[in-house]
Amino acid sequence: METIIIALIAFIIGIIAIPIVLFAWIYIKDEKQQEHSILRNYPVIGRFRYILEKIGPELRQYLYSNDNEEQPFSRKEYEQTVISGKYKSRMMGFGSVRDFDKPGYYIRNAMFPKQREEMHVNQTPKIETQIYKMDADNLFKRKEHAEHIKADPYFLHPDDVQVIGEHTCEKPFYVKGLVGQSAMSYGSLGERAVTALSKGLHLAGGTWMNTGEGGLSEYHLKGGADIICQIGPGLFGVRKRNGEFSWEEFKRKSRIDQIKAFELKLAQGAKTRGGHVDGAKVSEEVADIRNVEPGKSIDSPNRFYEFSNPPEMLDFIEKLRDVGQKPVGIKLVAGHPEELHELFSHMQKSGKHPDFITIDGSEGGTGASFYELADTVGLPIMTALPIVDTLLKQYGLRSQLKIFASGKLLTPDKIAVALALGADFVNIARGMMFSVGCIRALVCHTNTCPAGVATTDPKLQKALSVEEKQHRVCNYVISLREGLFNLAAAAGINSPIHFSKEHVVYRKEDGSIINIDNLIHQFVS
């Protein structure tokens, strides 16, 4: 009995003493450390500041921010993308949550919109995909089931199919839709994410997948999607070990049937310099594809060594097109109008030009960049796009090439505005990431993505089911195309290819409206 009493007393003393000793140890440690000022003045209790600071982003995202408040994407934009991918639905009730007092773009509606049967749309063949149906949704229970359906594809009418490189190369690219995946490299994304995207885009049809500057991987090809193969200043995928351009490797890539076009990346909206991939993401496989050393961070050159001015670049494009026999375009960020004048002037005088120009807005996404570049450098897409379109028309070049636009254009309304401002096609990256599970954790650059999307870590990637996510990608693309036809009908045109500047106005904060031509006149005069 005495032994039990002694043990009980010792246990009670331990219960009391251990927290006191632990508190004292933390107190002394905090008071003597030199890294954090708050902890030196407020030992122990000051730690709550850092705990709240750590969980603050999650609290704001899930509890405190309103539907239109967050950046780079609001809860409304995120949910619209996720719901259209999971349920293939864009329906809402009661009314818009848009703040109509703020300045912004609006689509002019027609007094007599087009009837459904008047729309120039191709609904064959049907697309076999999977959607979810909600059975019960309350505070403590959500029950839903998956259904296989045959969905309308919302392809462009055969008469409206867009052709890239029609008069310049032996193998032009025929496109039945206006929306595709923007550049995202394997290495920035994991193999499961890339595979799910490839399979989903192939299911949707009439679209494309841009490889990003990291080079072509087997995962891009795995699903069968049409590919635009991007070549950045690092020349990944088309380089020799010493970093020089390999014409043999380029020729080999150009013989792959899935590759429909090539794109030279001059710049990216979020980083108008060379790309960066942290060493933690550079696995053996990533290194092999890029022809670099594994485990070491990769920093691409800020620009191509192969050319340094418009004439040299246009000559390089001509050679790529001659060797590859496929369309070649450039990706740029609009900055100085004078530089655009110089480039387009050389195109006009020489008769040489790319088959397409991708304009990336400064608001575009990235796997890794510097704050100062992402926040400040380059023009936003809705400003840059009409400038480039207008200048191309001034130089008589607009009919000779296509324009791709990218930069937070992940809903049908924003895509329609971009088309009206001069785009022929729209690229989407982060919307595609949402459709394969991205939760906006904002840790793409760390290889610790909790959803298994922007990581090459096998343990984290197991979260992503390729077979399930491919359907969400497919549904998202179909929903975007359907939304574009809905908006076209409302604007009184029979296809979204007919959106033009006359269909859009910009409303100022004082309530007055500006026609787009007047809005951009000062930049291109």
Curated annotation (Swiss-Prot):
UniProt key word Oxidoreductase: no
Biological processes per GO annotation: glutamate biosynthetic process
Residues passing through the membrane, by range: 4-24
MF terms (GO), sorted A to Z: glutamate synthase activity
Location in the cell: Cell membrane
Keywords for the protein's UniProt record, in alphabetical order: Cell membrane, Membrane, Transmembrane, Transmembrane helix
Topology in the lipid bilayer: Single-pass membrane protein
Record flagged with keyword Hydrolase: no
GO CC field: plasma membrane
Main location: membrane
Signal peptide, first to last residue: none
Entry's family note: Belongs to the glutamate synthase family.
Name recorded for this polypeptide: Glutamate synthase large subunit-like protein YerD
Source species of the chain: Bacillus subtilis (strain 168)
Gene name in the database record: yerD
